Amino acid sequence: MNYPHEFDVIVVGGGHAGTEAALAAARSGAKTLLLTHNIETLGQMSCNPSIGGIGKGHLVKEVDALGGAMAIATDEAGIQFRILNSSKGPAVRATRAQADRVLYRKAIRHRLENQENLWLFQQSVEDLIVEGDKVVGAVTQIGLKFRGRAVVLTAGTFLNGLIHVGLQHYSGGRAGDPPANSLGQRLKELKLPQGRLKTGTPPRIDGRTINYSVLEEQPGDLDPIPVFSFMGSAALHPRQLPCWITHTNERTHDIIRGGLDRSPMYSGVIEGIGPRYCPSIEDKIHRFADKPSHQIFLEPEGLDTHEVYPNGVSTSLPFDVQYELIHSLPGLEHAHILRPGYAIEYDYFDPRGLKSSLETKAISGLFFAGQINGTTGYEEAAAQGLLAGINAARYASDREAWVPRRDEAYLGVLVDDLVTRGVTEPYRMFTSRAEYRLSLREDNADLRLTEIGRELGLVDDIRWDVFNRKRDAIQAEVQRLQSTWVNPRLLPEEPAQALLGKAIEREYALADLLKRPNISYEALMQARNGAGELLAGPGLLGDDVLAEQVEIQIKYAGYIERQRDEVQKHVVHEQQAIPADIDYDAVSSLSFEVRQKLKTHRPETVGQAARISGVTPAAVSLLLIHLKRLHYGKRAI
């Protein structure tokens, strides 16, 4: 039957991409339907119980700045928080949290069930309704037809999913869930370019059978306690737990080597390529054969469970080998395995077949987000889901898509990398992928994106008010420090020596003093003048977030300004559109190889064309000349 109501946006899948897509579309004002095979697993953390990390935490902060759910849900569910790279510069510092799986799922479901314009329905999707080259709905396993103006597909690892444990394999979307084989077959019929990828997960351990006395404890950060959401606070955090560290040894490695002949990876059973930066334990032992030991993190899965996730031993080895290797680890000699580790192969679609909006080029109104695009990780999925949800809603209401630039957000870097370069292995975000990372920091994600989110209809009044007060306070303090001056009379030799390590010989703005590498904002605010009074006043002391932002903006002002100038030089051609119907064969001055690459990838902008492997700067110049001729030719007509 046909469902009696139509929707603007239909989201298929309730993982990290699907939930953010549904929330974003609904917040944008679109009548949205989220279809999931099981409402109980909405927001499920299928693999590791953690959110964030280098590059990944930046994406989570950006999703949050645009009104998304992942960061605040992590604050409500996080049982350990840490800042990675805390001793390095602000551009590469990153937040990471261990999360209670049950609390996280509960936090996400609460937001889904209380979001206006959003309907939930439990049914697996087996088919898409496509009319001509346009998607108009989805069909569930009982033949129920839902019609909508746009469809966002976030199928994760479910498309023709195949689970491997040793040389045994069976169909599944993840352990305990059926695959989406019918939908996978339907997508193949649409002639979308596709391939196979692989990911894996470790066996889970009963924490009551671990000997913690021989392990190294790894507590979370306490001063200050990190917070993920710009709307969050440490008061939201549940009880905190430590993680623990153990190591592999030569016996572990011998056990693994002895089982490689029954490994689906090394016996040729698995076709898909796995994530480079999250390799299986057998892959690590094989690739780094000279390394005598590998670190393993034992991560608690939640407050009300004894289950422990051994991060670092993802494996698809036979269970008897898994059993032996786990028991070879210090502290785990008598550990009970609750669930076996496994690898899963699944279909993905070449993201070069997508527009930058994440709409497929072949089928109008069909958007892809998450692992279906060849990425790995909850954070990458959530970011894509948010963007796909925004643009599906805009498509449904005949509005222009929003696409962040590489200099605006890690989300812009992520999408541009995918649609321009494609993937040959699961894509993971790192700060090193962003050429403008000094400007794209975790700490300023809201200052970069919340105003845009407000314009897109994603940011509610409460968040908008909090953001405005924060932004105004930072701007006022920066201006005060830039316009307040001190001279040798106000700061005589003795207090100057205490603050600066030497006397000042002329007048300085407080901002100039703060730019010095050995001066912190806190030290400047606590400095006294010759009369024993505060030199700069209390300022924003007491609010670590605002104080940090003021210090970063002033200390890095010169570097950021140079980067801004660099962006301005590139942005003119970066965003210059290339007509969808351009005839590259008419650009005879381009080499045959370059013309073939451009015809294959069909870049949307000159910036995208420039990042295609093999397209040289000289070729870009020739393309610009041709586009200029086309422009003037149209004007003449």
Curated annotation (Swiss-Prot):
Q: Which cofactor does it need?
A: FAD
Q: One Pfam family, short name please?
A: SAM_GIDA_C
Q: Which SUPFAM superfamilies match?
A: FAD/NAD(P)-binding domain (SSF51905)
Q: What is its main location?
A: cytoplasm
Keyword NAD, does the record have it?
A: yes
Q: Which domain of life is it from?
A: Bacteria
Q: Which residues bind FAD?
A: 13-18
Please tell me one Gene Ontology term that the record gives under cellular component.
Answer: cytosol
- Localization terms from the record: Cytoplasm
Q: Where does NAD(+) bind?
A: 274-288
Q: Which GO terms describe its biological process?
A: tRNA methylation; tRNA wobble uridine modification
Q: Tell me the InterPro entries matching this sequence.
A: FAD/NAD-bd_sf, GIDA_C_N, MnmG, MnmG-rel, MnmG-rel_CS, MnmG_C, MnmG_C_subdom, MnmG_C_subdom_sf
Its transmembrane ranges are none
Alphabetically sorted, this entry's keywords are: Cytoplasm, FAD, Flavoprotein, NAD, tRNA processing
A single GO molecular-function term is: flavin adenine dinucleotide binding
Range of residues in the leader sequence: none
The annotated subunit structure for this chain is: Homodimer. Heterotetramer of two MnmE and two MnmG subunits.
Give the similarity note: Belongs to the MnmG family.
> Which PANTHER family does the record associate with it?
GLUCOSE INHIBITED DIVISION PROTEIN A, PROTEIN MTO1 HOMOLOG, MITOCHONDRIAL
What is its biological role? NAD-binding protein involved in the addition of a carboxymethylaminomethyl (cmnm) group at the wobble position (U34) of certain tRNAs, forming tRNA-cmnm(5)s(2)U34.
Name the chain's protein: tRNA uridine 5-carboxymethylaminomethyl modification enzyme MnmG
Protein species of origin: Bordetella avium (strain 197N)
Q: What is the lineage of its organism?
A: Bacteria, Pseudomonadati, Pseudomonadota, Betaproteobacteria, Burkholderiales
UniProt lists the gene as mnmG
